[in-house]
Amino acid sequence: MKQYLDLLQHVMENGSDRGDRTGTGTRSVFGYQMRFDLAQGFPVLTTKKLHLRSIIHELLWFLKGDTNIAYLKENGVSIWDEWADENGDLGPVYGAQWRSWPKPGGGHIDQIANLVESIKTNPNSRRHIVSAWNPAEVDEMALPPCHCLFQFYVADGKLSCQLYQRSADIFLGVPFNIASYALLTMMVAQVTGLKAGDFIHTLGDAHLYANHFEQARLQLTRQPKPLPVMRINPDVKDVFGFAFEDFSLENYSADPVIKAPIAV
């Protein structure tokens, strides 16, 4: 995807070298935006192969409201292993905030259920928002949410999504985030009777770790291929009713994986 390669090149050429929490060092810019028309294909990288299984299972895990890595491990997904405690728990991370945001007087708010209902009943609303950033619980999370707030927008029979990501690990994290939220947009569009529009990805601190520079340079030598098509089982009408088998990526051709270390 040219949009992603443009981001890589922009940060490599214009970013500021800074320290960071992990001690690895980064090159970063503050404030960057990419836009993907989902009618033009599914926005998954073709200049390095991505593990789509991990992306789909992680999204389904979020939608379950789950915060223990047991489901992920059962399905061969290890992307959260470094942050889990000895029992596999992560604290009140994404799934908890999406599905059971605690109310001050007791009880919980299911933001995803409310979102879907709001899109169906009041599509022109400017309040189609889900937040994972809960200041009261951030300190209890194994990792505070990087992709922390998203908003949906309905126009001309199409559903678009804008994500704000406060912290963006460009080489390892951002490709997963693009595909994940593009897929979420398609799923929500299907269950609300709409077509998928655009996915807009807004980044706050967009950074390349110093030990990813060589990998980024290699990726920039590769040419993007045509985007694949994501097929979703049309019979699923409940956003919580999707299973892994309901998704099929067709015509995905990608360059080999480029390995890079995770900064924890």
From Swiss-Prot:
Its EC number is 2.1.1.45. SUPFAM superfamilies: Thymidylate synthase/dCMP hydroxymethylase. Keywords: Cytoplasm, Methyltransferase, Nucleotide biosynthesis, Transferase. It is found in: Cytoplasm. It catalyses: dUMP + (6R)-5,10-methylene-5,6,7,8-tetrahydrofolate = 7,8-dihydrofolate + dTMP. The keyword Transferase applies. InterPro entries: Thymidate_synth/dCMP_Mease, Thymidate_synth/dCMP_Mease_dom, Thymidate_synth/dCMP_Mease_sf, Thymidylate_synthase, Thymidylate_synthase_AS. The active site is at residue 146. It is an enzyme of class 2 (transferase). DUMP binds at residues 21, 126-127, 166-169, 177, 207-209. The keyword Protein transport does not apply. GO terms for biological process: dTMP biosynthetic process; dTTP biosynthetic process; methylation. Pathway: Pyrimidine metabolism; dTTP biosynthesis. It holds the Pfam family Thymidylat_synt. Signal peptide: none annotated. GO terms for molecular function: thymidylate synthase activity. Gene3D superfamilies: Thymidylate synthase/dCMP hydroxymethylase domain. GO terms for cellular component: cytosol. (6R)-5,10-methylene-5,6,7,8-tetrahydrofolate binds at residues 51, 169, 263. Homodimer. Catalyzes the reductive methylation of 2'-deoxyuridine-5'-monophosphate (dUMP) to 2'-deoxythymidine-5'-monophosphate (dTMP) while utilizing 5,10-methylenetetrahydrofolate (mTHF) as the methyl donor and reductant in the reaction, yielding dihydrofolate (DHF) as a by-product. This enzymatic reaction provides an intracellular de novo source of dTMP, an essential precursor for DNA biosynthesis. Belongs to the thymidylate synthase family. Bacterial-type ThyA subfamily. This is Thymidylate synthase. It comes from Allorhizobium ampelinum (strain ATCC BAA-846 / DSM 112012 / S4) (Agrobacterium vitis (strain S4)).
